[in-house]
Amino acid sequence: GPEKTILGGEQWAWLEQTLKDSDATFKLYISPTPVVGPDRKTKNDNHSNATYAHEGRRLRELLSSTRGAFVINGDRHWQYHSIDATTGLNEFGCGPASDAHAGGWKPGNRLPEHQFLRVAGGFMSVQISATKMTLQTHDVSGQVVYEHLIEAAADGE
């Protein structure tokens, strides 16, 4: 229910104020766990699952209403890019650092929110300029396996 929280009141207040005050073109919300997901139904430790559904909805709404905000997640054992169907919030999962630790999601189980799905190891890199941001997902040898470009929103958007 609404009383369940991962962030707590003090962190919520800080996050809301920081996002409001920021004049950065791009705002990276880096989370140890998914905000958009999807995640396995058996998990109950993050904002993409039913256990924290109320706070997850609130967080997705806050981030999606903040120009230039998106999520990078580090604790799923697969690489992905998902877009929340309700809010349009983008989330990028960097996956495990090694192929040996990949798993927990079936490679063929690509859901509608998945823009990219790869059950393997690697890392992410992000290049940011004043007008665009490029996120790249790499395999363990450093080869780019996925790239996504986000352009800065024009004033009034």
Question: How would you name each of these model-derived features?
Answer:
Residues 1-157:
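Metal-dependent phosphoester/phosphodiester hydrolase catalytic core
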